[in-house]
Swiss-Prot record:
Lineage: Eukaryota, Amoebozoa, Evosea, Eumycetozoa, Dictyostelia
Pathway the protein contributes to: Phospholipid metabolism; phosphatidylglycerol biosynthesis; phosphatidylglycerol from CDP-diacylglycerol: step 1/2
The protein, known as: Probable CDP-diacylglycerol--glycerol-3-phosphate 3-phosphatidyltransferase
Source domain of life: Eukaryota
Entry-linked PROSITE patterns: PLD
Residues of the PLD phosphodiesterase domain: 248-274, 487-520
Region (Disordered): 27-65
Organism: Dictyostelium discoideum (Social amoeba)
Length: 581
């Protein structure tokens, strides 16, 4: 009993992650202070809910003996994942019914068509006008779109981010929100941040909560500032881990920015470096209420589970009356979160591009542009390990495993430390694969102080070991790695692209907050979209975005690593704690 009670404290992965942030977390290192939280209720931390990925109320999928993800390839990190619906066990009745449209394909390409049905078995599908989709390239353009979105909004502004910075650009963004509230009496604002990161005090004695405090005080009836608190930080851990270190247990990591019916989805936070010289990815989906409403609902549900900023004491978080405390009622909190969020995962639900409601249709053939040969679909995915919601992990695993041999596959990951599942799927695949990650100089921790200064070298060792495994598995001619290197810039872009045979440009991209690592899978709240299209203009935009990221890169090979000197201490840290990075 004693060993079990002490296990969370001495768990080496948590200990190392905590030590890593002592002394700085990269270019935006700050000082810390303890956050005061008012909470009510009693309870204790329990194991996560063992319910399957989708609730019993969701439509079920006919079981096939052969899974699209071979059990020899798919690493199951938790027993509960065994209860999740395996991709490949979908019912083809949706594509082989007796209706007049049943013999038609969604996409002309066989792989795209099969992938469509696989993904629709795991959650809703949204038809989108491809002319309404654009990819942003520069951080400054990301910031300008945020400012412009705030200025244009008439009914809602919904933002989810890890945190809001405290520099001039962030203050200007909040100022524009105040002006927008003055101009539009019907406008409502909801901002969801991580409660631990959002109340951390910086060198300027400010935090996300204090920067937003005046906006909340002026318009408390129309402004909501939600602060998510992970239920995994409880008990002794809650008492002994100081601010900054406690963030390693789990955070709200979704990055979505909604302005009326426009959605800007990214991996970028609301911070100066993400507005200036930290390269990320950003997709803008305009005038598409169905997709915007879906992501707005994600934020609303998480917000309903979160603590809230006290307008009278801006760095203090309050628990709403009747709410479940994530700290003292951890198990109840997880069960409630699962129940609420799993309602989003409605399989075989199709939303037409011209729909002004949240109503879906029964068949994708009832949508508008299904017969023009250039249809475009978006599949949102969420990953919330603390609540046992693993939709993104399941579909990403399937994509890694199912990419056709004659396709071109591209992955970007700034912190390249794939889960063992993803790594095995990549190494046993056959398509040509190009990977881009950050060089040590482009790592966000480069130049920081304390143990965190070792982070770039830790990732360099992991990258070298990956290259060695590529060689050892005879994948040297198939898999290549590039490193992003740009003077005074850091790299934070995440996602992938797939270019199928007989296509000149990518037809598929994944973009959002997940990073393909164990932290994204197990600890944080994540969301992204899978975009599939045969529209030539949109494919060209996807190609341009991909090529832009590859512009400032250098080839990474084993010879390069022979020139990099890594201390024995760093090697020891990776040897002991590498699976957690």
């Amino acid at each position: 009993m004693i060993k079990r009670a002490l296990a969370p404290i001495v768990q080496p992965q948590r200990l190392f992650a905590a030590l890593m942030v002592i002394g700085g977390g990269g270019r935006s290192a700050t000082t810390t202070t303890t956050t005061t939280t008012k909470a009510c209720g009693n309870g204790s931390s329990q194991s996560p809910p063992s319910t399957p990925l989708l609730s019993s109320k969701s439509s079920t999928i006919t079981s096939n003996k052969k899974s699209a993800i071979p059990s020899s390839h798919l690493y199951i990190p938790k027993k509960s994942t065994l209860d999740s619906r395996q991709i490949g066990n979908y019912s083809r009745e949706y594509s082989t019914s007796s209706s007049s449209s049943s013999k038609k394909s969604i996409f002309n390409d066989t792989y795209l068509n099969d992938l469509f049905w696989q993904l629709s078995s795991q959650g809703p599908a949204f038809e989108v006008n491809p002319n309404n989709i654009d990819f942003i390239q520069e951080p400054i353009d990301f910031y300008n779109h945020l400012i412009d979105g705030v200025k244009r909004s008439k009914k809602r502004i919904t933002m989810a981010s890890l945190y809001l910075g405290t520099s001039k650009q962030e203050i200007e963004l909040v100022k524009e929100m105040k002006l927008a509230m003055e101009r539009n009496k019907e406008l409502k604002i909801h901002i969801l941040l991580d409660g631990l990161r959002g109340t951390r005090i910086g060198l300027d004695k400010e935090s996300s909560a204090t920067i937003l405090g005046e906006l909340l005080s002026l318009y408390s009836d129309r402004v909501t500032i939600s602060m998510y608190h992970t239920p995994d930080l409880n008990g002794i851990l809650k008492k002994v881990l100081p601010p900054r270190i406690n963030e390693t247990i789990g955070v709200q990591h979704i990055k979505t920015y909604i302005f009326d019916d426009d959605l800007l989805l990214s991996g970028a936070n609301l911070s100066k470096d993400y507005f200036t010289n930290r390269q990320d990815r950003y997709v803008l989906i305009r005038s598409t209420s169905t997709v915007s409403n879906y992501f707005n609902e994600i934020v609303e549900i998480i917000g309903s589970l979160s603590l809230h900023v006290d307008k009278d004491n801006r760095n203090q978080l309050l628990l709403s009356s009747g709410s479940i405390d994530p700290v003292t009622q951890s198990n109840e909190f997880k069960n409630l979160a699962y129940t609420k969020l799993s309602t989003l995962l409605k399989s075989h639900s199709y939303y037409p591009s011209n729909s002004n409601s949240n109503s879906s249709v029964d068949s994708p053939f009832d949508c508008n542009n299904i017969n023009n040969g250039e249809t475009t679909w978006i599949f949102p995915t969420i990953q919330m390990g603390p609540f046992n919601i693993r939709q993104d992990e399941v579909v990403t695993s399937h994509i890694f495993e199912s990419v056709p041999n004659d396709s071109k596959f591209f992955i970007t990951s700034p912190y390249f430390n794939l889960t063992e599942n993803y790594l095995n799927l990549i190494l046993t695949g056959k398509p040509k694969l190009d990977i881009i990650t950050c060089s040590p100089q482009a790592n966000g921790f480069y130049g920081s102080k304390g143990l965190s200064s070792a982070v770039p070298d830790c990732y360099a060792i992991i990258e070298k070991r990956f290259l060695q495994r590529v060689q050892d598995t005879d994948n040297g001619d198939r898999i290549s790695v590039q490193e992003y290197i740009r003077d005074k810039w850091t790299y934070h872009a995440k996602g992938l692209w797939i270019q199928v045979k007989n296509q000149q440009h990518p037809s598929i991209t994944l973009i959002g907050s997940p990073n393909f690592g164990s932290r994204s899978v197990e600890k944080d709240l994540e969301a992204q979209i899978i975009l599939i299209t045969q529209n030539k203009q949109l494919q060209q935009k996807m190609e341009n975005e991909k090529n832009y990221l590859w512009t400032d890169t250098q080839n990474a090979n084993l010879e390069l690593f022979e020139k990099r000197k890594v201390s024995l201490m760093v090697r020891f840290l990776v040897y002991i704690f590498g699976n957690y990075l």
